[in-house]
């Protein structure tokens, strides 16, 4: 079985998530709900984007949830 590295994966949370007052908290919550270990609100251009960091469980590619992309080579 080929296990993938536990790289950072972007969240599917909308960019507006981090622009609200409680955005960072919602960002963390949505990342945790998706099975990620943490979250960052990173400035991308003029919007802060919710990005999840480090999958809590390192899944082989074929067992990953469909919204989790394979890491770029």
UniProtKB/Swiss-Prot annotation:
Top-level taxonomic group: Eukaryota
GO terms classed as biological process: defense response to fungus; killing of cells of another organism
Alphabetical UniProt keywords: Antimicrobial, Disulfide bond, Fungicide, Plant defense
Disulfide cysteine pairs (residue numbers): 6-58, 18-41, 27-50, 31-52
Residues of the signal peptide: none
Family: Belongs to the DEFL family.
The name this protein goes by in its record: Putative defensin-like protein 42
Species of origin: Arabidopsis thaliana
Lineage: Eukaryota, Viridiplantae, Streptophyta, Embryophyta, Tracheophyta
């Amino acid at each position: 079985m080929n296990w993938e590295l536990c790289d950072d994966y972007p969240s599917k949370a909308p960019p507006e998530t981090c622009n609200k007052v409680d955005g960072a908290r919602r960002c963390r919550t949505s990342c945790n709900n998706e099975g990620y270990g943490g979250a960052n609100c990173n400035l991308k251009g003029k919007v802060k984007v919710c990005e999840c960091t480090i999958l809590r469980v390192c899944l082989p590619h074929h067992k990953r949830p469909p919204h989790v992309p394979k890491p770029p080579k």
